[in-house]
Amino acid sequence: MEKQTVAVLGPGSWGTALSQVLNDNGHEVRIWGNLPEQINEINTHHTNKHYFKDVVLDENIIAYTDLAETLKDVDAILFVVPTKVTRLVAQQVAQTLDHKVIIMHASKGLEPDSHKRLSTILEEEIPEHLRSDIVVVSGPSHAXETIVRDLTLITAASKDLQTAQYVQELFSNHYFRLYTNTDVIGVETAGALKNIIAVGAGALHGLGFGDNAKAAIIARGLAEITRLGVALGANPLTYSGLSGVGDLIVTGTSIHSRNWRAGDALGRGESLADIEANMGMVIEGISTTRAAYELAQELGVYMPITQAIYQVIYHGTNIKDAIYDIMNNEFKAENEWS
């Protein structure tokens, strides 16, 4: 592939890690953010210490606060901003962009009030004459591992296979490999909903439960993620792939996962306010829990784990009581769909 110019919108942990992957592949990378001190740190010291204390970035990675300067003559734009501001940033891009580009996003969540997937938001806000079909970049990936060039395999999903293949080639190298998929709904819902299950898995750990319980919540969590995804039009096979069970395993079992750590703290009795303050990073599983719960209610999809976590987070239900309620649900066959 010829050298591409890519704007990475969002200098968080994942945006920074993906910027390094693109830079390693010989592309021109421009990171955009709205915190001048962070942008100055990246440009002056080539670090982003809020997320990576011991990592030095390549000096060719340049950061900007000016969106117009960031987007000038770019070939592709990668959104890696928090779910709640995706629409706002997309509107700003639409007002600034003056040529057609490849649009990608690597965030995982649902818009809190509309319950919409992020690709839908980007389609709504960025006119077709300025963009390709949206490409979702998602899968089992800790930024802390990717930034040190540990092996990572994820998915590029788009309704247009050729566009997904462009992104596959854009990112792939000896330590970072992408597979293509045309099931955008499946890949996006898997990436968003696994954060909820990770909160629950972390809570079980915080409460002192063992591996049996953790395996159960991952398996049963995958079942309800699949039910909701299929109700939205996803291919059920997607959930057995990298962006499905793969992402659920890495997020639902690891201390590197901020959603798992948030659940662990909840299980140990910390308040949500204290957890969010101490974390210093967005916990997408919290807002996604409400969106998924409300969407499941709207569609009539059975999601007992999501419902339990929703009750704990938003109504103050005792976690042990929520677990008791799940364990005392009516008996069902394992493969029962409702």
Swiss-Prot record:
<feature type="binding site">
    <location>
        <position position="258"/>
    </location>
    <ligand>
        <name>NADPH</name>
    </ligand>
</feature>
<dbReference type="GO" id="GO:0047952">
    <property type="term" value="F:glycerol-3-phosphate dehydrogenase [NAD(P)+] activity"/>
</dbReference>
<feature type="binding site">
    <location>
        <position position="13"/>
    </location>
    <ligand>
        <name>NADPH</name>
    </ligand>
</feature>
<comment type="similarity">
    <text>Belongs to the NAD-dependent glycerol-3-phosphate dehydrogenase family.</text>
</comment>
<protein>
    <recommendedName>
        <fullName>Glycerol-3-phosphate dehydrogenase [NAD(P)+]</fullName>
        <ecNumber>1.1.1.94</ecNumber>
    </recommendedName>
</protein>
<dbReference type="GO" id="GO:0046168">
    <property type="term" value="P:glycerol-3-phosphate catabolic process"/>
</dbReference>
<keyword id="KW-0520">NAD</keyword>
<feature type="active site" description="Proton acceptor">
    <location>
        <position position="194"/>
    </location>
</feature>
<feature type="binding site">
    <location>
        <position position="194"/>
    </location>
    <ligand>
        <name>sn-glycerol 3-phosphate</name>
    </ligand>
</feature>
<dbReference type="GO" id="GO:0005829">
    <property type="term" value="C:cytosol"/>
</dbReference>
<keyword id="KW-0444">Lipid biosynthesis</keyword>
<feature type="binding site">
    <location>
        <position position="284"/>
    </location>
    <ligand>
        <name>NADPH</name>
    </ligand>
</feature>
<dbReference type="Pfam" id="PF07479">
    <property type="entry name" value="NAD_Gly3P_dh_C"/>
</dbReference>
<dbReference type="GO" id="GO:0006650">
    <property type="term" value="P:glycerophospholipid metabolic process"/>
</dbReference>
<dbReference type="InterPro" id="IPR036291">
    <property type="entry name" value="NAD(P)-bd_dom_sf"/>
</dbReference>
<dbReference type="GO" id="GO:0046167">
    <property type="term" value="P:glycerol-3-phosphate biosynthetic process"/>
</dbReference>
<feature type="binding site">
    <location>
        <position position="14"/>
    </location>
    <ligand>
        <name>NADPH</name>
    </ligand>
</feature>
<keyword id="KW-0443">Lipid metabolism</keyword>
<dbReference type="InterPro" id="IPR011128">
    <property type="entry name" value="G3P_DH_NAD-dep_N"/>
</dbReference>
<feature type="binding site">
    <location>
        <position position="141"/>
    </location>
    <ligand>
        <name>sn-glycerol 3-phosphate</name>
    </ligand>
</feature>
<dbReference type="InterPro" id="IPR008927">
    <property type="entry name" value="6-PGluconate_DH-like_C_sf"/>
</dbReference>
<keyword id="KW-0963">Cytoplasm</keyword>
<keyword id="KW-0547">Nucleotide-binding</keyword>
<comment type="pathway">
    <text>Membrane lipid metabolism; glycerophospholipid metabolism.</text>
</comment>
<dbReference type="InterPro" id="IPR006109">
    <property type="entry name" value="G3P_DH_NAD-dep_C"/>
</dbReference>
<dbReference type="InterPro" id="IPR006168">
    <property type="entry name" value="G3P_DH_NAD-dep"/>
</dbReference>
<dbReference type="GO" id="GO:0051287">
    <property type="term" value="F:NAD binding"/>
</dbReference>
<keyword id="KW-0594">Phospholipid biosynthesis</keyword>
<feature type="binding site">
    <location>
        <position position="143"/>
    </location>
    <ligand>
        <name>NADPH</name>
    </ligand>
</feature>
<dbReference type="Pfam" id="PF01210">
    <property type="entry name" value="NAD_Gly3P_dh_N"/>
</dbReference>
<feature type="binding site">
    <location>
        <position position="139"/>
    </location>
    <ligand>
        <name>sn-glycerol 3-phosphate</name>
    </ligand>
</feature>
<feature type="binding site">
    <location>
        <position position="247"/>
    </location>
    <ligand>
        <name>sn-glycerol 3-phosphate</name>
    </ligand>
</feature>
<feature type="binding site">
    <location>
        <position position="259"/>
    </location>
    <ligand>
        <name>sn-glycerol 3-phosphate</name>
    </ligand>
</feature>
<feature type="binding site">
    <location>
        <position position="258"/>
    </location>
    <ligand>
        <name>sn-glycerol 3-phosphate</name>
    </ligand>
</feature>
<keyword id="KW-0560">Oxidoreductase</keyword>
<feature type="binding site">
    <location>
        <position position="257"/>
    </location>
    <ligand>
        <name>sn-glycerol 3-phosphate</name>
    </ligand>
</feature>
<dbReference type="GO" id="GO:0008654">
    <property type="term" value="P:phospholipid biosynthetic process"/>
</dbReference>
<feature type="binding site">
    <location>
        <position position="108"/>
    </location>
    <ligand>
        <name>sn-glycerol 3-phosphate</name>
    </ligand>
</feature>
<feature type="binding site">
    <location>
        <position position="108"/>
    </location>
    <ligand>
        <name>NADPH</name>
    </ligand>
</feature>
<feature type="binding site">
    <location>
        <position position="282"/>
    </location>
    <ligand>
        <name>NADPH</name>
    </ligand>
</feature>
<dbReference type="GO" id="GO:0005975">
    <property type="term" value="P:carbohydrate metabolic process"/>
</dbReference>
<comment type="function">
    <text>Catalyzes the reduction of the glycolytic intermediate dihydroxyacetone phosphate (DHAP) to sn-glycerol 3-phosphate (G3P), the key precursor for phospholipid synthesis.</text>
</comment>
